[in-house]
């Protein structure tokens, strides 16, 4: 894991950390209190994959009894999500592949989500519909990738001896507004991580829901610097620029002004390879730096820092370069530093 930037030197950070520890001890404040983190990024930048990595690396706070008690909730979640896809298909021009799939979709719609018995046949029906090209088109164009979690695990879930995993339960908590959260511990710190899978167009509607978070992890896909997508019939935008604009919108929100910020640069391997054949000038024609990894990432970093006007807080930059354990450890070390600084500043004030 590489640290591209921190506003203070490591020596300064160490001194600050010592001062903060003293203040925390004097005021009997404990870091063991819950650290609340929002993880966000544009569609398909790898937010859900990173979120699942954190959940898997952390220690679950869910008991075995709670796992079994939620078995039916897993089944209900699958049916309700599949119904959403089917209803969209029925109300749009996106048709299912054949009459057999249409008949199966009608059977799913007729199921009472609150009162039905899951069996192998229902599982097979759900899998066939999930693999339908029409359902896939709806999923890929209109839903965050975590909506597909249970469908990708249908074979395991349909086993008669199925017991939900802690990760399954975290994904049950998916709500209609596209928000999912998970609680876990990492190195004795209790983490509450929230993934915001909603679209950018509805961000302002929900951003006030996250006023209590202490840190933001904003994920950026480096490899899309040459890709332009259409937002509507009259407007198109570069995908990297869209991510940078999303970062600007997040950090300018009055509800998140007090948060620490971690920018997570993702898909660096694809980015490195693409630079060999696609000049970075494709993204910015005025770019005059070298066409190498370090120069281009520093350019992106500086653009993000230009958006960030809070002199009392650091922006941390991470690149996904090492093992999952190292990813988590580096991230959580920064989170602890962020929370300690927030606590220290509140003590001073």
UniProtKB/Swiss-Prot annotation:
Residues 33-349 form the G-alpha domain. The keyword Transferase does not apply. The keyword 4Fe-4S does not apply. One of its GO terms (molecular function) is G-protein beta/gamma-subunit complex binding. GO terms for cellular component: cytoplasm; heterotrimeric G-protein complex. Belongs to the G-alpha family. It comes from the Eukaryota. SMART domains: G_alpha. It holds the Pfam family G-alpha. This is Guanine nucleotide-binding protein-like alpha-10 subunit. Residues 262-269 are annotated as: G4 motif. Residues 320-325 are annotated as: G5 motif. Residues 36-49 are annotated as: G1 motif. The lineage of its organism: Eukaryota, Amoebozoa, Evosea, Eumycetozoa, Dictyostelia. Residues 191-200 are annotated as: G3 motif. Residues 168-176 are annotated as: G2 motif.
């Amino acid at each position: 894991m590489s640290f591209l930037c921190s506003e203070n030197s490591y020596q300064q950070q160490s001194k600050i950390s010592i001062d903060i520890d003293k203040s925390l001890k004097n005021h009997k404040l404990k870091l063991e209190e819950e650290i609340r983190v929002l993880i966000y990024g544009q569609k398909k930048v790898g937010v859900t994959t990173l979120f699942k990595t954190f959940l898997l690396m952390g220690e679950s706070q869910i008991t075995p009894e709670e796992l079994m008690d939620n078995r039916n909730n897993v089944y209900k979640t699958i049916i309700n999500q599949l119904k959403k896809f089917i209803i969209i298909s029925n109300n749009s021009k996106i048709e299912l592949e054949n009459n057999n799939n249409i008949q199966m979709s009608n059977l799913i719609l007729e199921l009472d989500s609150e009162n039905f018995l899951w069996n192998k046949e229902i599982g097979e029906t759900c899998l066939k519909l999930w693999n339908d090209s029409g359902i896939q088109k709806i999923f890929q164009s209109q839903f965050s990738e975590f909506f597909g979690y249970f469908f990708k695990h249908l074979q395991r879930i349909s086993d008669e001896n199925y017991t939900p995993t802690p990760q399954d339960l975290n994904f049950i908590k998916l709500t209609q507004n596209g928000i999912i959260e998970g609680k876990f511990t990492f190195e004795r710190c209790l983490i509450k991580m929230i993934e915001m899978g909603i679209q950018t167009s509805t961000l302002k509607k929900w951003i006030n829901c996250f006023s209590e978070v202490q840190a933001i992890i904003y994920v950026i896909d480096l490899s899309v610097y040459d890709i332009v997508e259409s937002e509507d019939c009259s407007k198109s935008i570069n995908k990297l620029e869209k991510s940078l604009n999303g970062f600007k919108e997040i950090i300018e929100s009055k509800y998140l002004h007090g948060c620490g910020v971690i920018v997570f640069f993702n898909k660096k391997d694809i980015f490195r390879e693409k630079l060999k054949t696609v000049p970075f000038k494709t993204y910015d024609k005025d770019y005059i730096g070298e066409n190498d990894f370090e120069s281009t990432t520093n350019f992106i970093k500086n653009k993000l820092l230009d958006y960030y006007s809070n002199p009392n807080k650091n922006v941390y930059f991470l690149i996904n370069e090492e093992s999952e354990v190292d990813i988590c450890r580096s991230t959580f070390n920064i989170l602890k530093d962020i929370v300690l600084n927030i606590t220290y500043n509140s003590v001073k004030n």
